[in-house]
Amino acid sequence: MNRSRWLMSIGLALSQAVLLGCSPTPDPPPIPFAKKSGEQYSDKVDLARLEHESPLTPADLMKITPDNLKGATQEQVDQIYARLTAGPIPGGVYDGQMFFPKGSSERARLAEIVGGGIKGFVVDRKAAKLEHIGEFIWKGKVFYRSEGVLRNRIEDLHALKPIVGPDVERIKKLDVDGKDAWLLFPAKLYCGQSLLDGRRESVIIDYAFTDDLPGYREMPDVLAGREGLEIRDEIRMVRPGFYLGRAYMKKVFALNFSLYNQEVADKESPSFVGSGTINEDCWVGNQRTTAMASKAGNQHARLTETR
């Protein structure tokens, strides 16, 4: 199967996986949001002012979950993301979920983004088990913090065998909760400017130039890189063990995703709630964050102060 077919197949799979897995939409996180933006550019939410007037306290952040994010509109998800900092670059295994916010039209145009600019492709829905491909890149990630590298956790190699080849079993394998998982689609980790909110950095997950990483395989790893989907992710920490991410394909925003590590959450959340402080690996910008006590509930807010 040629590369163009696989790129389009992945795009179709992403849309199909979400549509087949639809469930009742939950309510959005019960936290403060700015009013909905108007149609004019001048009516858009000022993210710096929003954070100054309605900072998210640790208590607010504890109310956000991977599930209730799916009940928020894209504008609400953006407002949450803009009030977060990068936090520490993660380390270890994280479970991932991609999601399309309430009222979003991303499902309909995702395959269009993936297929844009690819000439001569033939849409072949029977080319692979599309439902398995849909969440490959955002299903789960393994962070090698000290190396500045990330690899994606694949739990079913069957759909990839036609392009990986007969030596598929040589791909590095690890055990996750008693299940076999394979590591593919490497990416480089670093701090960089957010494409949504340039006031501070995010943790960047970059698939563009990864052919020099140990274990790189031209197929299928090239599909996520500069000659394929040109995927670039960015993440910020909601609270310990929980990150909110934005995925871009071909420089166009494509979808949101969440990453969660239960062990880290259980271990570090109590101290976070009590102190409101975290370690920051990335630049937090001129609108710096500090821990301050809330008079009402003695909660500590990650408040912003303009220098």
Region locations from a protein language model:
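Bacterial N-terminal signal peptides that target proteins for export
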Residues: 1-10
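Soluble ligand-binding/transfer domains with enclosed cavities or grooves
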Residues: 27-305
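C-terminal motif of bacterial Sec signal peptides marking the signal peptidase cleavage site
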Residues: 20-21
